[in-house]
UniProtKB/Swiss-Prot annotation:
The gene is ligA. PANTHER family: CHROMOSOME TRANSMISSION FIDELITY FACTOR 18, DNA LIGASE. Its EC number is 6.5.1.2. Belongs to the NAD-dependent DNA ligase family. LigA subfamily. Its cofactor is Mg(2+); Mn(2+). This is DNA ligase. SUPFAM superfamilies: BRCT domain (SSF52113), DNA ligase/mRNA capping enzyme, catalytic domain (SSF56091), Nucleic acid-binding proteins (SSF50249), RuvA domain 2-like (SSF47781). NAD(+) binds at D35, A36, I37, Y38, D39, S88, L89, E117, R140, E174, K290, K314. The keyword Kinase does not apply. Keywords: DNA damage, DNA repair, DNA replication, Ligase, Magnesium, Manganese, Metal-binding, NAD, Zinc. DNA ligase that catalyzes the formation of phosphodiester linkages between 5'-phosphoryl and 3'-hydroxyl groups in double-stranded DNA using NAD as a coenzyme and as the energy source for the reaction. It is essential for DNA replication and repair of damaged DNA.
Amino acid sequence: MTEKEKIRNEVFELQAKINEWDNAYYNLDAPLVEDAIYDREILKLKKLEEQYSSYFSFEELANSPTQKINAKSSDLFKKVTHDSPMLSLNKAYTEEEIQKFIDNIKKVTPTFSFFLEPKIDGLSISIKYRNGQLFQAVTRGDGLVGEDVTENIKQIKNIPKEIAYQKPLEVRGEVYLALSEFEKINLNFQKENKPLMANPRNAAAGTLRQLDKEIVANRNLSAFLYNIVAPEDHNIFTILEARDFLKNLGFSVTKEATYAKDLSEINSYIENFKHLKKTLDYETDGVVIKLNELQHYDALGATNKFPHSAIAFKYEPNTTTTVLKNIFITVGRTGLVTYNAELEPVILSGSCITFATLNNYQYIKDLKLNKGDLVYIKKAGEIIPCVIGLVNKKHEETEFNKFLKCPYCNSDLIETDTLLEQYCSNENCPEIRRKKIIHFASKKAMELNSLGEKNIDVFINEGLLENVIDFYKLKEKKDKIMSLERFGTKSVMNILKSIEESKKNSLDRVIFGLSIKHIGSKVAYFLASKILKLSNFLDFDFDSLISYNEIGEKIISSLKNWVAKEENKNLVKDLLDNDVDLEFIATKKTERFAQLSFVITGTLSQPRSHFEKLIKENGGSISSAVSAKTSYLLVGEDAGSKLAKARALNVKILDEEAFNELLVS
């Protein structure tokens, strides 16, 4: 195969893949890949088409997804041709690309300024008014033809149905679903056992295409307006004037927009907005940079897809590509199966990544992954690296088969009702037992400092540890331990001392260490504050905890099932017989956060455990989920759905600076 044939094949494969993604995004409201992956591939295609344009005919390039918007009008709504095209925006990822955009403007005019605003992740809309009345609303569609959604647009409360302006007017903007409203909808869907909506953008697009306008009204869509068609007809000559005009007529505009004179001010806004965007109640992944002076727009021109008068800056995601060498499963202390990826080593966010999580089999199936494929991986802050998408398949026809047997004991793997989780069916699986023993000795549990994972494996292999209770019987086997390689008198005495010291731990440590399903360290701390002593554990009335925010029916059911098993009863009794009757020791130093419940989300300047410790030391409690009973949500970078839920429930939101102020107030 010649170089030309290779390039042509690569370009056609990219075009086909992106066309499939475009169809899912624009027409099915069901995106197949994250924005970061889409942007990377469209940029790759664009560069190939530009570099090797002589290899292709005019028609082959003109029909590329880099040159047109791949959206179709639905048959459910009347098709409407736009009076002027509704174009998309070209993207920039670096300062150099923004400078290139500015240099292009300099060719037309020596004096200019810019208008900057958030890039809203919603659905583009064009709205016409006649004699001050909302007359017609049309989606962008493919940029030339859209769908008439007038009746649905009339259900959006912040879009005026009439305005104090009699001349014909066409305005354009973005319909979106606020993160708080998105969370409310999914909470209701959850209660009604309906499938949850994937993200606010999909929810907004799907809502706007509803045939029942009552559904649209109930979902509380919103809109930001930012553009006026034929602005000179209304004596408008800059974006700033257009914004004021829209605002005075009662349209909603983004409060976070600003004016900039040069690249330095643009860069300053981009840097500041990176932190500001996490506090907003709508999804945004970048900044739109527009030439402020409208009279130069015609001279700058446009492609079939993008104008040259504006560009969208997008923040660089923490993603890269590498080869998926192998897929394997691990079994956790509760028997839960996790699918994992072995990767060709790659540097990401300053770390060498060789392994990443694949979550579960359905995740692999949805992404169509298999061994040998080139994949995207992502890492943010302390989050475990994760495979997030497929770049290229090694073998198009093959599908990865689900694991059906436990690799450690060869027992059947059983599935939950949702088919998303698999568990090893053997409660005596050696790997489950091993993970339970390792967990019991871990830092957050009983903190047996002198016993690392390697030493525990040696003890298990030598028959010294079969259950967590065996830690407290090791002193009887001191001579056997000392006969093992690398275990001298001093190291053995340190191990035994560490085990003896653990008997002074707080009750929550041992509850967490018992590997009870759904019981993390935060729940264990709460349980310990109510149970008070390990000797109370087996007879405690767990149903009495249902009224507390930290405890749900799933946790209560798990606790009752655990204490009902004879082997677990015997384990607790053995611990008590070996003087491990731990009592609850409150860690608080002050009452500053007494009666306050905190949830933490996002990446902070210190490990999450640092902030959890501060909260507990000052009398506060930690919860893993936001609810109406949550006092504060502490947010860091890349805060996710918890932030939206907090807004929906009017929970107070703190960044790290505000938290520190609260701590010393």
